[in-house]
Amino acid sequence: MEERNLRKTRTGKVISNKMDKTIVVAVQDNVKHPLYNKIVKRTYKLKAHDENNECLIGDVVKVMETRPLSKDKRWRLVEIISRAK
């Protein structure tokens, strides 16, 4: 049970739910530019497993790392933090 606590978690916004039991989550990171030392926003997309097809576009969700479920899918939905308005 302790091993699950070591898994990575990310919070992001659902940008697509067109696939069956799969959502695409956009996660935003703030990284420091190596030369200019400015904080730059970096966005990357993750495919996550949504077992019950309960997410809608615009929802803010928490995803957790898991074993590979398909070619691109290595994350699963933990909870829906807030619903789209």
Curated annotation (Swiss-Prot):
- Extract the PROSITE patterns matched here: RIBOSOMAL_S17
**UniProt keyword Ribosomal protein, yes or no:** yes
Give the record's keywords alphabetically.
Ribonucleoprotein, Ribosomal protein, RNA-binding, rRNA-binding
Provide the GO MF annotations for this entry.
Answer: rRNA binding; structural constituent of ribosome
A single Gene Ontology CC term: cytosolic small ribosomal subunit
**How does the annotation summarize its subunit structure?**
Part of the 30S ribosomal subunit.
Instruction: Enumerate the NCBIfam families for this protein.
Output: PRK05610.1, uS17_bact
Which named protein is this? Small ribosomal subunit protein uS17
- Encoding gene per record: rpsQ
